[in-house]
A protein has these predicted regions:
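N-terminal helix-loop segment corresponding to the beta1-alpha1 unit
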Residues: 1-99
């Protein structure tokens, strides 16, 4: 939908509810950028069948993240925190979502 194309969401998400919500918003045309820890990754990577034959790229993870962009960022590191704050400013984030 063109109605939502100018809305940017930065999402720090895991589990089921928020990833599903941001999936729906991405399908409605919003730009969704999800943050993922560079070492631990998203636990959803391990759910479902391994349909591609690639490590940590299982079916549920692929489906629930369709239409989203992704960045890896270590928020425990001061440099990661600095990048996080600059992302919010420079991307003109309309919504920050976390669970």
């Amino acid at each position: 939908m063109d109605l939502f194309k100018d809305i940017t969401i930065l999402s720090l998400e895991q589990a089921t509810v928020l990833p599903y919500l941001t999936y729906r918003l991405a399908q409605d045309g919003m730009q969704v950028i999800r943050l993922e820890h560079p070492i631990y990754g998203d636990p959803n990577r391990m759910i479902g069948e391994n349909v591609l034959g690639e490590e940590r790229m299982n079916a549920y993870f692929l489906c629930i993240n369709a239409g989203k962009k992704a960045l890896t960022l270590n928020l425990a590191d001061p440099e990661g925190q600095k990048i996080f704050h600059s992302l919010i400013k420079e991307l003109n984030v309309d919504i920050f979502a976390t669970n």
